[in-house]
């Protein structure tokens, strides 16, 4: 359908202006202060109705209600099995976090690292909580979840077996901030058991709102020590994992394979004239330590100056130890670094700071879950984000360079020295939302990733709205992340200044999941989601007014009789005959059902009936819609692919945003991801009715109408 210069546009306004990503939100709507005040007033200790102390809170499988591990479990408040419980004994330290039997060392290693930074820890564990003054059996913690900080309230009933805490505990037996933090995390995700198995960076991100990277040491370790030193100096949280293909086991040197460790420090010492790079690590189990070179009992410490030795070496079986970098590289496979956001770090003293954009999205089967292969027919339907990098990195003075020797680790490599090409370093982080909570339903993390394409200047104007598959092959791929089944997939990209298209995807077309995409850079950038403005061409709303063929008009009069108007069943009979010629071009009859005919009466008639002049207008619409449908019914099967519904609606004169297109696709496609002619007619008639109604409130029938998101979705979906 040709477009007219006139247009009806729906402008969406935010009814919750001022609610930013940094604003604290109450998980389950529970206010710590309100609950505490109510409990103190009533004299009754808090019992959390949203996370009841019982079998479901423990788990669903190995910790399920009938499991061996769940037998004999009692839920007890600390004062019921501890003489003088304290929330915090003096200061919080990394020795406060000791692992129990849950298998969540990834979480505990991250918590241990967090204790090194009191300012960060105070954000997660708000001060002013204890078991003495104003105790009401309620505590709260603040955790980051997919772009928002959540305040999570818990009661202090903890799972106890044979008089001992089942899960995390403190080395100081009467300290309980760590077990209660673990409970808050379990509540956020549905149960304790869903915390079994994970990656340290996942907890790092949830504790800080930062962005996590995984460094694969077997691929390249050049520049690692410098990267770690600078990461720790910038208050990044750092961990390491020794991978295992047969579960957790202890090596002869005292390391636990398949286990997560915290990296808590770096130091350079001289052994004679040889420079030695040392890393300080901590094992959450506490009692199992490295026994090789530079371990607590290693004689090499005796060769160092007393002042240096006393500053570094603490001989205690607390799970913390030093090891040389070359030994670390022999025994560990990955390093995780979580760089912190400006929201947590505060303004940069140099005035630079970080630039961050966060987007929320969803892959929907049949709409925008197009898979990861750029040459696939559905790849173009994936969500798309336009990234513009405006300023190149600054020059770096670091001598030690490597794959991690750049921004966020060992400083930013820049363009000036040696005439190097200007580069912009940016971190792209793709997060699958809420998949850990879905473990209880048998679901797990999908394999996901993203592509980065460069947009040449001559095509830049074409990427203001979702584009078809015809344009994507014209773009050069600038970078891509690995496909991974982790919650967080992060890639450090080094790109030239310019314009880029970021396309996140699942590995397989049709997989469904919610996601968060974040863009981090120290230099200025802009990022926007590729989306359409909601509008309709005025000509598509006016519709053609075609004279009816004599035979069709006579048939109308015969069916209408003395009433001179058709009801729904009569309209169905008329359309069945009128659309007969179209059946010669398809293997599937183009029938219009009774329910759709009732809808057409609502849109084009008086609600219950249709006069001749109204049918004349409807028939003009149907002929145009049929021509559009035929264009997208390439195999003459009588259906079109639901992934192409957006393009068909564009051809009909309707331009819709991603949210509405997703809603309509889910509503009008069938289980085979196909849209037949009747469903297409119903969808387009639905939109015609909406925009015609809106245009009546505009001068001349065209212009802009402002609606809130809620008002628009209510109008657009008739909800």
Swiss-Prot record:
Residues 620-655 form the EF-hand domain. PROSITE patterns: CALPAIN_CAT (PS50203), EF_HAND_1 (PS00018), EF_HAND_2 (PS50222), THIOL_PROTEASE_CYS (PS00139). The active site is at residues 105, 259, 283. SMART domains: calpain_III, CysPc. Keywords: Calcium, Hydrolase, Metal-binding, Protease, Thiol protease. Calcium-regulated non-lysosomal thiol-protease. This is Calpain-12. It comes from Homo sapiens.
């Amino acid at each position: 359908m040709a477009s007219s210069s006139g247009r009806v546009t729906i402008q969406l306004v935010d009814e919750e202006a001022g609610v930013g990503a940094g604003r604290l939100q109450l998980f389950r709507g529970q206010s710590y202060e309100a609950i505490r005040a109510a409990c103190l007033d009533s004299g009754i200790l808090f019992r959390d109705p949203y996370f009841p102390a019982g079998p479901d809170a423990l788990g669903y499988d190995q910790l399920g209600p009938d499991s061996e591990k769940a037998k004999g479990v009692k839920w007890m408040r600390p004062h019921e099995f501890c003489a003088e419980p304290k929330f915090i004994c003096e200061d919080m330290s990394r020795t406060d976090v000791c692992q129990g039997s849950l298998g969540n060392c990834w979480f505990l290693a991250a918590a241990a690292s967090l204790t090194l930074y009191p300012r960060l820890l105070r954000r997660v564990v708000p001060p002013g909580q204890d078991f003495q003054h104003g105790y009401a059996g309620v505590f709260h913690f603040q955790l980051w979840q997919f772009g928002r900080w959540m305040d999570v309230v818990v009661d202090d009933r903890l799972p106890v077996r044979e008089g001992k805490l089942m899960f995390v505990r403190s080395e100081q037996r009467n300290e309980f901030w760590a077990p209660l933090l673990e409970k808050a995390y379990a509540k956020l995700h549905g149960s304790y058991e869903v915390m079994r198995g994970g990656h340290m960076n996942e907890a790092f991100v949830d504790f800080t709102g930062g962005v996590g990277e995984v460094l694969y040491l077997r691929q390249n370790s050049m520049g690692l020590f410098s990267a770690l030193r600078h990461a720790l100096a910038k208050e990044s949280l750092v961990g390491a994992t020794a991978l295992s293909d047969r579960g957790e086991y202890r090596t002869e040197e005292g390391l636990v394979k398949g286990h997560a460790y915290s990296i808590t420090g770096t130091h350079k010492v001289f052994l004679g004239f040889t420079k030695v790079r040392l890393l300080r690590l901590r094992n959450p189990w506490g009692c199992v330590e490295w026994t090789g070179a530079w371990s607590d009992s290693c004689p090499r410490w005796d060769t160092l100056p007393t002042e240096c030795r006393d500053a570094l070496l603490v001989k205690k079986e607390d799970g913390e130890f030093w090891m040389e970098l070359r030994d670390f590289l022999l025994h560990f496979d990955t390093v995780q670094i979580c760089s912190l956001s400006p929201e947590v770090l505060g303004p940069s003293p140099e005035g630079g700071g970080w630039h961050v954009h966060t987007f929320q999205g969803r892959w929907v089967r049949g709409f925008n879950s197009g898979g990861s292969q750029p040459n696939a027919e559905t790849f173009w339907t994936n969500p798309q984000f336009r990234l513009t990098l405006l300023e190149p990195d600054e020059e770096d003075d670091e001598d030690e360079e490597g794959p991690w020797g750049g921004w966020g680790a060992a400083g930013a490599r820049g363009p000036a020295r040696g005439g190097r090409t200007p580069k912009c370093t940016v971190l792209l982080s793709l997060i699958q939302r809420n998949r850990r909570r879905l473990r209880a339903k048998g679901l797990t993390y999908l394999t996901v990733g993203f592509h980065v394409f460069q947009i040449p200047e001559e095509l830049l104007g074409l990427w203001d709205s979702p584009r078809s598959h015809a344009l994507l092959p014209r773009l050069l791929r600038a970078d891509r992340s690995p496909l991974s089944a982790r919650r967080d997939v992060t890639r450090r990209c080094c790109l030239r200044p310019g314009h880029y298209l970021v396309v996140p995807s699942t590995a397989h077309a049709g997989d469904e999941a919610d996601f968060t995409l974040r863009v981090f850079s120290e230099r200025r950038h802009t990022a926007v989601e590729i989306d359409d403005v909601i509008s309709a061409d005025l000509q598509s709303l006016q519709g053609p007014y075609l004279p009816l063929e004599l035979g069709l008009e006579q048939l109308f009069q015969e069916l209408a009789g003395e009433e001179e108007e058709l009801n729904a069943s009569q309209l169905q009979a008329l359309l069945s005959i009128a659309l007969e010629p179209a059946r010669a071009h398809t293997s599937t009859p183009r029938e219009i059902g009774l329910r759709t005919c009732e809808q057409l009466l609502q849109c084009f008639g008086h609600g219950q009936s249709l006069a001749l002049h109204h049918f004349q207008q409807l028939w003009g619409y149907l002929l145009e819609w049929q021509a559009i449908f035929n264009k997208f019914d390439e195999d003459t099967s009588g259906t079109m692919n639901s992934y192409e519904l957006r393009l068909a609606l564009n051809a009909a004169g309707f331009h819709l945003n991603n949210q509405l297109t997703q809603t309509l696709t889910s509503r009008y496609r069938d289980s085979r991801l196909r849209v037949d002619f009747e469903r297409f007619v119903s969808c387009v008639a639905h939109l015609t009715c909406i925009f015609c109604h809106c245009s009546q409130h505009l001068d001349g029938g065209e212009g802009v109408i402002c609606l809130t998101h809620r008002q628009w979705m209510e109008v657009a979906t008739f909800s």
